[in-house]
A protein has these predicted regions:
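Short, amphipathic alpha-helical interaction segments embedded in low-complexity terminal/linker regions
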Residues: 210, 215-301
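Cofactor-/ligand-binding subdomain signature composed of acidic, glycine-rich
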Residues: 1-43, 47
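Aromatic/hydrophobic pocket-lining residues that form π-stacking "cages" and hydrophobic walls in ligand
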Residues: 57, 153, 211
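Gly-rich Lys/Arg/Thr-decorated short loops/hinges at beta-loop-alpha junctions or inter-strand turns
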Residues: 11, 32-40, 100-111, 223, ...
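Glycine-rich phosphate-binding loops that contact phosphosugars or nucleotide phosphates
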Residues: 69-207, 215-219
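Active-site pocket-shaping loop/turn-to-helix segments
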Residues: 49, 111-112, 232-234
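A short, well-structured juxtamembrane/interface segment
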Residues: 46-61
Length: 301
């Protein structure tokens, strides 16, 4: 394997503010970290137009039945998995609709798999195993912007006509160049040199939050700022569903629960029933007619 040159990467540079990190008092140490973390939001802000473009493109593909794949290694891969697994309970997405792939497979989430991220063939193999097609979206995540696993995945995605997005934390990287829609949240040197689980990881999480949340908002999974497609799979989420219906209908918890019971726990239908005073079957028809949009269903005559 050829020698890797990391000297040009901002994420690998020494942070001049923390060259004496081990000598700082604990308060000064965490203050330095907090000060550096403040820069993350600014790095993401600079990329908002690109992030918005990616959200719209992802939503358009998913509306036609496409899937969203996050692909990364190490921390980047784990962040993709983390975002993907939250989509089913939050938006009633299927486990197929948003998937997180990490170099080395599921076991690499808890323990690093030696050499997996350095392979340009594992990424294509992982995507091929999931039947990647032209309707799908692949988001390549790599703080460094040079991870071979991600580069291979993006190249394969392009070859089958899938939309490609990159989320990186260095400017002018190979991963960004390999994607149709690159997002470069340049966070600079880490407090601990090269530890991209810190600022770069935080920036990546913020971007992924926007990509998935924004896409599902565009897919009518949200009404106002209410999580109206929540899956009521545990006590906390059942209680949240009651509160959501209560907020949307402007009713007490008792009536909200009754509406949910009438609608077999479907929050969207319960809101339409409560607001329009229609039967659950009519509410479901209105929602189906208006592509799942609570707002449009409520506005319908």
């Amino acid at each position: 394997m050829s020698k890797i040159d990391l000297t040009a990467l901002a994420t690998e540079a020494r942070n001049p503010r923390t060259t004496e990190l081990d000598a700082l008092s604990t308060l000064d140490l965490v203050t330095a970290m907090n000060d550096e973390d403040r820069k993350v939001a600014d790095a993401v802000q600079r990329e908002l137009p690109r992030i918005a473009a990616a959200v719209d493109a992802i939503a358009a593909r998913m509306h036609k039945g496409g899937r969203l794949f996050y692909v990364g290694a190490g921390t980047s891969g784990r962040l993709g998995v983390l975002d993907a697994v939250e989509c089913p309970p939050t938006f009633s997405a299927t486990t197929e609709q948003v998937q997180g792939l990490i170099a080395g497979g599921a076991g690499a989430f808890l323990q690093a798999v030696e050499g997996a991220e350095d392979s340009t063939t594992l990424g294509p193999a992982d995507l091929q195993a999931r039947g990647l097609g032209s309707k799908d979206v692949v988001v390549g995540i790599a703080a460094s912007g040079r991870t071979p696993y991600v580069l291979g995945a993006l190249a394969f995605a392009k070859s089958v006509g899938a939309l490609t997005v990159a989320v990186v934390c260095n400017a002018g990287s190979p991963v960004a160049a390999a994607a149709e829609l690159p997002i470069e949240a340049v966070t600079g040197p880490e407090v601990l040199t090269g530890s991209t689980r810190l600022k770069a990881g935080t920036a990546t999480k913020l971007v992924l939050n926007m990509l998935s949340t924004g896409a599902f908002v565009r897919l009518n999974k949200v009404y106002g700022n209410l999580m109206v497609d929540v899956q009521t799979t545990n006590a906390k989420l059942k209680a949240r569903a009651v509160r959501i219906v209560g907020e949307a209908v402007a009713c007490n918890e008792t009536l909200a629960q009754q509406l949910l019971d009438q609608c077999d726990g479907e929050v969207k239908a319960a809101i339409v029933v409560g607001r329009k005073r229609v039967a659950p079957a009519v509410a479901r028809t209105l929602l189906l007619t208006h592509d799942g949009s609570v707002r449009d269903a409520l506005a319908a005559p």
